[in-house]
Amino acid sequence: MAERTMAMPTQIPADGDTQKENNIRCLTTIGHFGFECLPNQLVSRSIRQGFTFNILCVGETGIGKSTLIDTLFNTNLKDNKSSHFYSNVGLQIQTYELQESNVQLKLTVVETVGYGDQIDKEASYQPIVDYIDAQFEAYLQEELKIKRSLFEYHDSRVHVCLYFISPTGHSLKSLDLLTMKNLDSKVNIIPLIAKADTISKNDLQTFKNKIMSELISNGIQIYQLPTDEETAAQANSSVSGLLPFAVVGSTDEVKVGKRMVRGRHYPWGVLQVENENHCDFVKLRDMLLCTNMENLKEKTHTQHYECYRYQKLQKMGFTDVGPNNQPVSFQEIFEAKRQEFYDQCQREEEELKQRFMQRVKEKEATFKEAEKELQDKFEHLKMIQQEEIRKLEEEKKQLEGEIIDFYKMKAASEALQTQLSTDTKKDKHRKK
């Protein structure tokens, strides 16, 4: 019977066989163990599970939000057009199942409706903030469940906000600054200059510089492209200088030479959507979908959601430090809070018992006093009744005596009458 031998790890000396921090030794293996296939397992699992990406589009009505999304994914996702006659800002939410090769993407697009159409625009950002917080709250409640299933949970948190800026060519509107200021701590903001084909190339660059200057001066934090990852560093370095992206959307195909391209046909020529000399659409698409989608999701979870979670748990009485300012785990916090809640329940239960017993004693005293009053009243009435009975008995005896005397007198009267009648008869007989 063949024996199965295990390949033993051997230490590779480096710099005099030094050890790393925490006594972690760098080792290599001889032979095949199989854990080199872990990346393949993750890829297979991710493909099987599919991916989720949630986009929030904020901009005035008719600025081209739906058209740009259709252009990004090269399909018609939305047919109906929004009206300009909304009394309040609303949100339209649509979820789509997209597939490219063997990769499935569940895409959720949230678009503002009626944004910027009101006379009083001061609170236009509030429905957007409320929606983002509601998605954070839903995820937090799922996390706090005893039997939670985040693997199967549909993550509806907003991963990126495409903020559409009107191509005025001058500066940002007060509404833009107010909204982005209230959103920058909750979502990854990517500013876009919509309908960039309405501005000349020189004016467009001036407008970009003006926008970035206003964002910085107002302390508005937009999404910072990561440059610390090797795969994305070079691409992001070349793109970061283009912010805000000047974009044009179109799903129509026009003929340029002998080929059909997506673009817009004007009397003066053709604007090609995917021509980098005409607009920044290709740069935006590559940055958003090809390079940084996972980073946007990771930053949403580790920064924006964690900030919301921390503030929410603080309001609930949870902290991430102990009495001596030492960091503690969430499990320790939960157990301490659970014990505190249990002790509080015990105290409140004891207080309720004491209050109940006190009220019982008070009621018993009230009942005893009422019982005594009733007993005294009963005795008084009983005494009155007995006195009445005594008087009636005396009256009865008196009446009975009077009746006896009456019958005696009656009998005597009857005897006298009988005697008189007899004497009268004798006198008559004697006369005869």
UniProtKB/Swiss-Prot annotation:
<dbReference type="Pfam" id="PF00735">
    <property type="entry name" value="Septin"/>
</dbReference>
<feature type="binding site">
    <location>
        <position position="264"/>
    </location>
    <ligand>
        <name>GTP</name>
    </ligand>
</feature>
<feature type="coiled-coil region">
    <location>
        <begin position="332"/>
        <end position="412"/>
    </location>
</feature>
<keyword id="KW-0132">Cell division</keyword>
<dbReference type="GO" id="GO:0001669">
    <property type="term" value="C:acrosomal vesicle"/>
</dbReference>
<dbReference type="GO" id="GO:0060090">
    <property type="term" value="F:molecular adaptor activity"/>
</dbReference>
<dbReference type="GO" id="GO:0005940">
    <property type="term" value="C:septin ring"/>
</dbReference>
<dbReference type="GO" id="GO:0048471">
    <property type="term" value="C:perinuclear region of cytoplasm"/>
</dbReference>
<keyword id="KW-0342">GTP-binding</keyword>
<feature type="binding site">
    <location>
        <begin position="195"/>
        <end position="203"/>
    </location>
    <ligand>
        <name>GTP</name>
    </ligand>
</feature>
<dbReference type="GO" id="GO:1905719">
    <property type="term" value="P:protein localization to perinuclear region of cytoplasm"/>
</dbReference>
<feature type="binding site">
    <location>
        <position position="114"/>
    </location>
    <ligand>
        <name>GTP</name>
    </ligand>
</feature>
<dbReference type="GO" id="GO:0005856">
    <property type="term" value="C:cytoskeleton"/>
</dbReference>
<keyword id="KW-0966">Cell projection</keyword>
<dbReference type="GO" id="GO:0001764">
    <property type="term" value="P:neuron migration"/>
</dbReference>
<keyword id="KW-0968">Cytoplasmic vesicle</keyword>
<feature type="region of interest" description="G3 motif">
    <location>
        <begin position="111"/>
        <end position="114"/>
    </location>
</feature>
<dbReference type="InterPro" id="IPR016491">
    <property type="entry name" value="Septin"/>
</dbReference>
<dbReference type="GO" id="GO:0031105">
    <property type="term" value="C:septin complex"/>
</dbReference>
<feature type="domain" description="Septin-type G">
    <location>
        <begin position="49"/>
        <end position="315"/>
    </location>
</feature>
<dbReference type="GO" id="GO:0032153">
    <property type="term" value="C:cell division site"/>
</dbReference>
<feature type="binding site">
    <location>
        <position position="249"/>
    </location>
    <ligand>
        <name>GTP</name>
    </ligand>
</feature>
<dbReference type="GO" id="GO:0003924">
    <property type="term" value="F:GTPase activity"/>
</dbReference>
<feature type="region of interest" description="G1 motif">
    <location>
        <begin position="59"/>
        <end position="66"/>
    </location>
</feature>
<dbReference type="GO" id="GO:0007286">
    <property type="term" value="P:spermatid development"/>
</dbReference>
<keyword id="KW-0175">Coiled coil</keyword>
<dbReference type="GO" id="GO:0043204">
    <property type="term" value="C:perikaryon"/>
</dbReference>
<dbReference type="GO" id="GO:0030425">
    <property type="term" value="C:dendrite"/>
</dbReference>
<keyword id="KW-0206">Cytoskeleton</keyword>
<dbReference type="GO" id="GO:0005525">
    <property type="term" value="F:GTP binding"/>
</dbReference>
<dbReference type="GO" id="GO:0005737">
    <property type="term" value="C:cytoplasm"/>
</dbReference>
<keyword id="KW-0131">Cell cycle</keyword>
<dbReference type="GO" id="GO:0015630">
    <property type="term" value="C:microtubule cytoskeleton"/>
</dbReference>
<dbReference type="GO" id="GO:0030424">
    <property type="term" value="C:axon"/>
</dbReference>
<keyword id="KW-0963">Cytoplasm</keyword>
<protein>
    <recommendedName>
        <fullName>Septin-14</fullName>
    </recommendedName>
</protein>
<keyword id="KW-0547">Nucleotide-binding</keyword>
<feature type="binding site">
    <location>
        <begin position="59"/>
        <end position="66"/>
    </location>
    <ligand>
        <name>GTP</name>
    </ligand>
</feature>
<comment type="similarity">
    <text>Belongs to the TRAFAC class TrmE-Era-EngA-EngB-Septin-like GTPase superfamily. Septin GTPase family.</text>
</comment>
<feature type="region of interest" description="Required for interaction with SEPTIN4. Required for migration of cortical neurons during corticogenesis">
    <location>
        <begin position="369"/>
        <end position="432"/>
    </location>
</feature>
<feature type="region of interest" description="G4 motif">
    <location>
        <begin position="194"/>
        <end position="197"/>
    </location>
</feature>
<dbReference type="GO" id="GO:0008104">
    <property type="term" value="P:protein localization"/>
</dbReference>
